[in-house]
Amino acid sequence: MQNRVILTLTVLLLAAGGLLPLVNFAPNRLVSGRGIGLAELLSGARLLLLLPALGLLALSFVAPTRVRYLIVLLLAEGLLCGLLWLAGEGARELAAQGGRLVRTSFGSGFWLMAALCLLIAAEAVGRLTANPCLRALGNGQLWLPLALLLASGRLDELSLMKKYVNRAQVFHQALGEHLTLLFGTLAPALLIGIPLGFVCHRSARWRPSLFAVLNIIQTLPAIALFGLLIAPLSGLAAAWPWLREWGTGQRG
């Protein structure tokens, strides 16, 4: 046994594919529907989707080399794309049989197998290089084939995509608000945190005082977690209405 990590993840992946549903099918969105496993969707040429999983299982028993880890990365990426494609094709077939009201969603098996594919790919990338930038590129490129598959329209019959189409405007508005909050807090944190980090690193005299202040500041999220900031924030929002417009209100 050469790589216990890949072997364990592959065995779990095969177990998830055999025991859990890949997609859930419902005649409409008012009923829960039933799970459909890989065995019902794999037929004919689709059986070739099993080859990447079998390849991963075989490679976990051979001596590891950079070339073999590259093959593991490609197999995990191909399997992930294949699972997504199969779910989309299954949704298209079920929609053709049942009409526009049917709903086909990802099942627990898909989510678990997708997560395991990403873990296998991350393990391979970590073995291929220790450079953080190259690791980020290796893990980031996993999403490119998925984005192309999404843009091709092969996934349009999945309930997730149908819901997105019906509520695209709301989705884009919420996404914009979340990104504004994210970068609106990240930017000042970086502008303040990076200079303070340099000061703490270079000046032993300022370090204790800065750490004392920062330790007090970092307790604020814990205080907010227990709802102890609801009353002060509500008072501030009542005193200065412009704070309410920025999202400050009855929240911890």
Where in the sequence are the language-model features?
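N-terminal, non-cleaved signal-anchor transmembrane helix
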Residues: 1-177
